[in-house]
Amino acid sequence: MRHRRRPGGRSTAGGTPVSQLSIPSPSIEAFHLGPLTIHIYALCILAGIVVAYISGGRRYQARGGKQEQFEELCALAVIAGIIGGRLYHVITDHQLYFGPGRTWYHCFFIWQGGLGIWGAISLGGLAIWLYCRRKGIRFASVADSLAPGILAAQAIGRLGNWFNQELFGRPTSLPWGLEIDLSHRPAGYLQYATFHPTFLYELVWSLVGAVFLLWVDRRWTLDHGRLFTLYVAIYTFGRFWVERLRIDPAHHVGQWRLNDVTALVVFTGAVVILIVLQRRYGKGDEHSSCPAHKTR
């Protein structure tokens, strides 16, 4: 049950006062339609997929691609992405599902939250690459078409974390602190009422990044995988600094959270690849675009 604030903006949950300017957490995570339980987290993921599909489809057709092929590869990518995202989450957070007192089959309850973006992008990307290889489609053209929409989709998906009251950051007294119910606060932080809204930080970062990608592509037409590589660099850089604020349980490599290390490694790789591609293909212009299909 969500703890309500008394007049004057103070929390009834105990601990630190809640600022009148703080961001409230939603009081529900799901709603019912007859016998069906609709989880808002799932709706956010679905909305993100729709945005990426519409954006990517239009951009892919503008590159000379066929809509029916785009629909097929998107269907494969979504299925593979969800499986990959869930696998990454279950593997890296296996203690949540396996061991004494745990219910192993809850690892299949994807609607409760828990998708690792690294697994989603990796397996989803592999599915697209295999499809492109089979159909004679340029993978780079598909990736560049999808890049802005994927980043926008990730922003929308972060709203699901808000409804689930999960993946927030350290306690803060800043006016945009996020109110978290007592039942959702991790051990050692029960006395705090407001936390960094890391979901919002990543949401804003991703939306700004998506707009930037669209602007860059319109200005210079980055092709041959350069726009997608730039997307990877933008996302991982933002994920790195946002991850530094989070306090949810995580595996560590030394003093660093695993996602921090992953983001740093992938960011470095993306920058190196972007430099190589830029040297190979030049700045680019509005008349230079990588076609969707390979020349036979």
Curated annotation (Swiss-Prot):
Amino-acid positions noted as binding a 1,2-diacyl-sn-glycero-3-phospho-(1'-sn-glycerol) in the UniProt annotation, renumbered to this chain: 158
Entry keywords, A to Z: Cell membrane, Membrane, Transferase, Transmembrane, Transmembrane helix
EC number: 2.5.1.145
Gene Ontology terms for molecular function: phosphatidylglycerol-prolipoprotein diacylglyceryl transferase activity
Listed transmembrane segments: 34-54, 72-92, 108-128, 136-158, 195-215, 227-243, 258-278
Coiled-coil segments on the chain, per record: none
Localisation per UniProt entry: Cell membrane
Membrane topology: Multi-pass membrane protein
Sequence segments annotated as region (Disordered): 1-21
Pathway in which the depicted protein is active: Protein modification; lipoprotein biosynthesis (diacylglyceryl transfer)
A Pfam family assignment: LGT
One of the protein's GO biological processes: lipoprotein biosynthetic process
Similarity remark: Belongs to the Lgt family.
Role summary: Catalyzes the transfer of the diacylglyceryl group from phosphatidylglycerol to the sulfhydryl group of the N-terminal cysteine of a prolipoprotein, the first step in the formation of mature lipoproteins.
Name recorded for this polypeptide: Phosphatidylglycerol--prolipoprotein diacylglyceryl transferase
Organism: Cutibacterium acnes (strain DSM 16379 / KPA171202)
Lineage start: Bacteria, Bacillati, Actinomycetota, Actinomycetes, Propionibacteriales
Gene symbol of the encoding locus: lgt
